[in-house]
Amino acid sequence: MSGNITTAIKETRAFLGRLKGDEEGMAFIEFGFALPIFMALGFTGVEVAGLAIANMRVNQIAMTVADNLSRAKQSVPLGLPQLREVDINDALLGARIQGGGSLEILEKGRIVVSSLQRNASGLQTITWQRCKGKLNAPSSYGAQGATQPSSGTSGFQGMGAGSNRVQAEANSAIIFAEVSYDYKPVFGDWVLGKIRLRREAAFYVRDDRDLTQIYNPSPTASASTCNKLDSTF
């Protein structure tokens, strides 16, 4: 019996000695410890890159919509050029095309376009506002008709965040675009979490244009009013 125990002890010591000197499996052990770290870094890198690209594309859409609608106009005989509902729809449709099938800007986001002007009292006001997209993300500055108070600094004072606020001059208008978008991560929400992108852009209206209203001559177009969460035209 004691001989068997002695033999077992010797074999155990011999095995431990061989194991101590065996370095063939060390690389696999090190790789096993390092793999989760490298995978986490890789996933994070891909997500950050995807987020940066989406952010850039959303920003470009905001700039394009505001720029296009600051230029859009239809010449009329013996009168100032007019902005039409179809012109606004064309700009919003162009944003969907610009975003492409991968971004799905109108399915996962919302575009809000406002015309910031001065009213007869010289106060900043949103004269008109149009929207498109299924995401429930209203304007951060109020709906159509929002007007600067006649006194005080509270309430609507213009559009833009913080020191970047813009105000329209007399007899002019600023086209202000807000684009909100729910970013869909490549690997799921567990890497960066849920992220909503939001970008703004503002352009002064080019040249002379009738600023009193949006026209809708025959054949009429469906107005992209902000009481609808849709992506159709």
Show which residues each predicted segment covers.
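Amphipathic, coiled-coil-like alpha-helical scaffolding segments used for oligomerization/assembly
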Residues: S102-L106
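Alpha-helical assembly-interface signal, strongest on the long, hydrophobic N-terminal helix that forms
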Residues: S2-I97, S114
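Intrinsically disordered, low-complexity regions enriched in Pro/Ser/Thr/Gly and acidic residues
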Residues: R96, E107-R198, A202-V205, Q213-T220, ...
